[in-house]
Structures are given as C-alpha cells and as structure tokens.
Amino acid sequence: MAISSSSSSICFNPTRFHTARHISSPSRLFPVTSFSPRSLRFSDRRSLLSSSASRLRLSPLCVRDSRAAEVTQRSWEDSVLKSETPVLVEFYTSWCGPCRMVHRIIDEIAGDYAGKLNCYLLNADNDLPVAEEYEIKAVPVVLLFKNGEKRESIMGTMPKEFYISAIERVLNS
C-alpha cells in the first residue's frame, strides 16, 4: 500500500497510544520495524508479545482522509439520482476485506476525476433498502449513474483500469 503525503493526510505516531503496543500480528497500518513476527513460531510470538519487557517499535502512521463521501438512504436521491454530474457509488460493508481494497481505488479515482465524477460510499448494512432496490447481493459492488439512471455495474474487486474504462464509457455516453 502506497501512502501518500498529500495535504489531506493526518500523520501520528502510534506509539503515543497505549493500544498500539498490544498488536498481536503485523499489519500494513502498523509496520513492525524491529523484527518480523511471521518468522517466529506461534509459541515464540506468544511469549514475546506477553513479555512486558518487550516493546514493539512501530513506525509512524499516516492516514489520509477519504475523498469519496458517504451517502445514505436520506441523501441518496439528492446526491445520486438528481445529480447533474455522473456518480460512482461503492456499496460496501464494514466487515468486508475486499471492500477496503476497493475503497483505496475509489479514493484515487475520486481525486483523479474531481469535478467530472462524484464518488460516494454506501454502507449496505446500514442502508439496506437502497442496496435491495439495486439488488446488491454481495459486496463490493460499484454502480455508475448518469442523469439518475444506472449505467454500469462492477461486482467484486477489480484493477483500477477496469473501473476507469467503465467510468470513461459513462462519461462519453
């Protein structure tokens, strides 16, 4: 995951937070710089992590604000159906791992197409009626709208170029 240092980034050092030292496995958000826990046997990891003398050294973390806005059932009509600008909506759930990968792609697209395309995220668990209306049975799903009509749908995690080609088809139609 490439971390950008744009003006909308918020950087903080996770070692300032007490919960940061209780990480049980490495993640992309908290890169471990002193050792690789994946190379340790499970018993070694458990004793290492339970030892109060051991401290994981964590590198600073940068988190960028999302460029895609949240849309809800209340704002759906005004934001999506009545929009004069073409709209991209990602349907996701909070527990969906692949949705996080699509979030990053949609975020990049929102920056690349600012002014030409409005990008939104809709939590399908929280706004089930909208998801049911568009027959969303699994997530992630990306729908593209133009003049209030659904023009394209993309199911699953795809490369950025796949989304770009669908967007270009909608913009040129």
Swiss-Prot record:
Belongs to the thioredoxin family. Plant M-type subfamily. This is Thioredoxin M3, chloroplastic. The active site is at residues 96, 99. Keywords: Chloroplast, Disulfide bond, Electron transport, Plastid, Redox-active center, Transit peptide, Transport. Thiol-disulfide oxidoreductase required for maintaining symplastic permeability in the meristem. Involved in redox regulation of callose deposition, plasmodesmata cell-to-cell communication and meristem maintenance. One of its GO terms (biological process) is positive regulation of cell communication. It comes from the Eukaryota. The keyword Plastid applies. The record marks 97-98 as: Contributes to redox potential value. The lineage of its organism: Eukaryota, Viridiplantae, Streptophyta, Embryophyta, Tracheophyta. Its main location: plastid. Pfam families: Thioredoxin (PF00085). Residues 1-67 form a transit peptide. Disruption phenotype: Seedling lethality when homozygous. Increased callose deposition and accumulation of reactive oxygen species in roots.
